[in-house]
């Protein structure tokens, strides 16, 4: 995006598995950013997305349609989507022609949910790399459904996927635990919330897995996976409830810090006006303890806490 000022644009690449809330996040974040005074352009990069709830500035479906690809090449949904992303990678001139008139906007890229696109397939990473050449500074926002915290085996799997995504995508990166307002619906947590957000000593998870006859046979494998995660020590999570302005603001602060966005004085005044009712003059990150008290009922003690009382 070289040429007339402003030469640098900022945005978010919203990624994550199907059902993690990417499209809902784009809707909620776009509304929040507009309330701050930012000009927002939401770009749909998922050719399988239909009936989008937000106003779409650019839609990859105008370039290539998943249904057409599946019919013409006799591919399944996953193979068809990979082909669509490779087709977009080969036709980036089309994407640049769509983005250039939106210079000066803050971009939200709603990306496909196929995990392999973010862990080992090269098309999406190549697209992001080319955007960097256009002076578009993105932060990868990786959404994970918070219900995985209630199952130790699934949480280890999520940690592995998050780590692989961080290493593969090659963008400034934050991980979100989405749908925090629904976490109680999935069962009790084995530990306090900060154990999962900060990814503390994972050996305790192994002890919980050892109580399951099925996973007891895979203890050595789980130990190696946990060791890999702890050796890199890169993964952590920010809790998110997209309906909560305070929660969205914590995420936005992390995103702006990651990609270097510096907001204007006018935006700061808009932020203070918006958040004063809920947060007063305190714009620092809330403690994880406060977040736990907000989203978990006082009677919902962790499994670990109940065991200690016996």
Curated annotation (Swiss-Prot):
Any Pfam family hit: ATP_bind_1
Stated role: Small GTPase required for proper localization of RNA polymerase II and III (RNAPII and RNAPIII). May act at an RNAP assembly step prior to nuclear import.
Protein name: GPN-loop GTPase 2
Residues reported in the UniProt entry to bind GTP: 19-24, 178-181
Site for Stabilizes the phosphate intermediate, residues: 78
Source organism: Homo sapiens
Keyword Repressor: no
Molecular-function annotations in GO: GTP binding; GTPase activity
Similarity annotation: Belongs to the GPN-loop GTPase family.
Keywords from the named record: Acetylation, GTP-binding, Hydrolase, Nucleotide-binding
